[in-house]
Design a protein with these regions (language model features):
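Metal-dependent nucleotidyltransferase catalytic core
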Residues: 8, 47-78
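Short connector loops at helix/strand junctions that flank enzyme active sites
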Residues: 19, 38-40, 68-70
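Catalytic metal-binding acidic patch
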Residues: 28, 33-52
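Helical scaffold of the NTase/Pol beta-like nucleotidyltransferase catalytic core
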Residues: 1-24
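Conserved beta-strand core positions
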Residues: 24, 41-43, 73
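A generic local structural motif
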Residues: 10-12, 29-31, 61-62
Length: 78
C-alpha cells in the first residue's frame, strides 16, 4: 500500500504525542511523491527535550512507529 502524506500524518501523530516528540519530518520517496509499493518511509524525529536517549527507548519509538504505519521505516533522530 502507498500512503498519502495525510495518512502518514494521521498514523504517526498518536505515537509522536505518546513519546512527547516535538516534530516529525518526512523525507525521501514519500516526501517527493515517488513512493512505490516496496518503499520504506523515511522519518526524521526531533527528540530534543524528551527522555528518548537510551537505545531501549529509541527502539520502542521505532517499533511503535513501524507498527502504526505497517511498513518498514528508516528513522533518524535529532
Amino acid at each position: 500500500m502507498i500512503y498519502s502524506i495525510y495518512e502518514i500524518q494521521q498514523r504517526i501523530a498518536p505515537v509522536a504525542k505518546q513519546y512527547g516528540v516535538k516534530a516529525v519530518f518526512l523525507f525521501g520517496s514519500y516526501a517527493r511523491g515517488e513512493a512505490r509499493e516496496d518503499s520504506d518511509i523515511d522519518l526524521l524525529v526531533d527528540t530534543s527535550g524528551t527522555n528518548l536517549r537510551s537505545l531501549l527507548s529509541l527502539g520502542a519509538l521505532y517499533c511503535d512507529l513501524e507498527a502504526a504505519l505497517q511498513k518498514p521505516i528508516d528513522l533518524i533522530t535529532v
